[in-house]
């Protein structure tokens, strides 16, 4: 057995993150008294409390250790107050990820997440290790033998186009916000409002500008997220071996993903309006409770050979539409309600506060896009059995997920309301290892019967 090793000091951040709210209690008392002496007392109490928490974090860090023996058995030990030990074998892992954000890279640390077979996400093991220890642990638990590497080039261009479009839209919102912030001449409606009180005049002047600046903030945050995704597509490599799939890449933040081929629960090809325009389709792979944030790879039209090489057992759902007779309108509710509210506010603002109308049109348009996604789900969502495998389409937001279930352990659950039973429809839920659920809504009974029969034959 190898000697026991300690975690990286960044592991103490997990404890501090959960207890940092305790430091706000003295400040809350100072806020109630609202005096300088109370504030100084609260700051001294916060400093003492923070020192105590740092000391407790150091004790926890010293009391925790891990060891990996020659047989590939990982032992995690905690010896604070009570001794605990958890044992993990490499064969019992469905997937693992190695993440190195910029802060971790500067401090020589890595975050390793281990996903045991069949366990839910809350049972995943997160370790903060030194860079060399993390790489050694991954190579010992899930060794890579004779990998075949590919560098698909579809992800960078798709991320760049989205980032450019977001930049242009954010600039347009910024121009609108600056224009709304300028003093504008009072119309007859605004003049009538100005005679009420100062608060109404303030709202009539600054409410349009405030709403516009909120949209600018939302666009900026979304752009930062797209920029992060673009940085992660740099130096992107996907590989496969006889028993594993994986990917690695990133520029400022590095990541690596490894999954056992036999433990892949399903593969998911996501169709979105942007993907259809660029003809580049992201493919996500889920193994147990491991749901990576980034796709395994992005392929474009004409690269189906790469798809078949990486996922030879994948089958696309058939290009047919399910029966739409008496189908539920549940697909339109998540986006239809915000769209109706935004549209109502637009109509009201035209007579009450015209300066706010243009700003309100933007969330209305966004809600309309999501409503179009709901229409796509209403038209296309369904489940089919192809070559003994469950294939399904399900809609979520603006994405249409084309899924092929690859794991043999599948449970089905049906749900029927009285209205659905009258029209021979039901909602079918697929349960996969790791407490993963896939729901297909309002499908005809005749489409679900072959799937139920296939599960009964397996049992």
Locate the predicted segments by residue.
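N-terminal basic, Ser/Thr-rich segments that initiate or prime the first beta/alpha elements at protein or domain
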Residues: 1-459
């Amino acid at each position: 057995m190898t000697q026991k090793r300690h975690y990286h000091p960044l592991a103490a951040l997990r404890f501090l993150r959960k207890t940092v709210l305790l430091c706000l209690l003295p400040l809350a008392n100072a806020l109630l008294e609202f005096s300088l002496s109370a504030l100084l007392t609260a700051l001294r109490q916060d400093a003492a409390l923070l020192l105590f928490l740092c000391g407790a974090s150091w004790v926890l860090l010293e009391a925790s250790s891990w060891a990996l023996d020659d047989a590939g058995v990982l032992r995690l030990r905690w010896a604070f107050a009570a001794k605990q030990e958890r044992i993990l074998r490499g064969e019992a892992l469905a997937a693992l990820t190695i993440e190195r954000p910029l802060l971790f890279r500067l401090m020589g640390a890595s975050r390793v997440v281990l996903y045991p077979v069949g366990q839910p996400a809350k049972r995943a093991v997160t370790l903060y290790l030194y860079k060399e220890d993390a790489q050694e642990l991954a190579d010992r638990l899930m060794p890579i033998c004779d990998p075949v590497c590919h560098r698909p080039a579809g992800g960078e261009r798709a991320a760049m186009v989205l980032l450019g479009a977001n930049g242009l839209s954010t600039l347009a919102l910024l121009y609108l916000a600056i224009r709304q912030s300028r003093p504008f001449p009072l119309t007859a409606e605004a003049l009538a409002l100005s005679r009420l009180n100062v608060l109404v005049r303030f709202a009539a002047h600054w409410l349009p500008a405030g709403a516009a600046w909120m949209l600018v903030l939302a666009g900026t945050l979304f752009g930062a997220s797209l920029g992060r995704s673009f940085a992660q597509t740099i130096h992107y490599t996907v590989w496969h071996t006889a028993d594993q799939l994986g990917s690695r890449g990133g520029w400022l933040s590095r990541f690596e993903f490894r999954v056992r081929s036999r433990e892949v629960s399903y593969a998911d090809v996501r169709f979105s309006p942007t993907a259809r325009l660029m003809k580049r389709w992201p493919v996500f792979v889920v193994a147990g409770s491991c749901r990576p944030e980034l796709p395994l790879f992005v392929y474009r039209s004409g690269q189906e050979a790469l798809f078949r090489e990486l996922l030879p057992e994948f089958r696309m759902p058939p290009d047919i539409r399910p029966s739409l007779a008496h189908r539920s309108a549940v697909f339109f509710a998540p986006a239809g309600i915000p769209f109706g509210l935004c549209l109502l506010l637009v109509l009201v603002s035209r007579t009450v506060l015209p300066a706010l109308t243009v700003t309100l049109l933007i969330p209305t348009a966004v809600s309309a896009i999501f409503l179009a996604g709901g229409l796509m789900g209403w038209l296309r969502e369904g489940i089919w059995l192809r070559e003994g495998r469950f294939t399904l389409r399900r809609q979520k937001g603006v994405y249409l997920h084309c899924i092929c279930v690859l794991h043999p352990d599948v449970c089905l659950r049906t749900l029927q309301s009285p209205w659905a039973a009258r029209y021979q429809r039901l909602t079918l839920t697929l349960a996969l290892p790791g407490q993963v659920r896939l729901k297909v809504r309002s499908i005809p009974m005749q489409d679900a019967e072959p799937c139920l029969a296939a599960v009964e034959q397996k049992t």
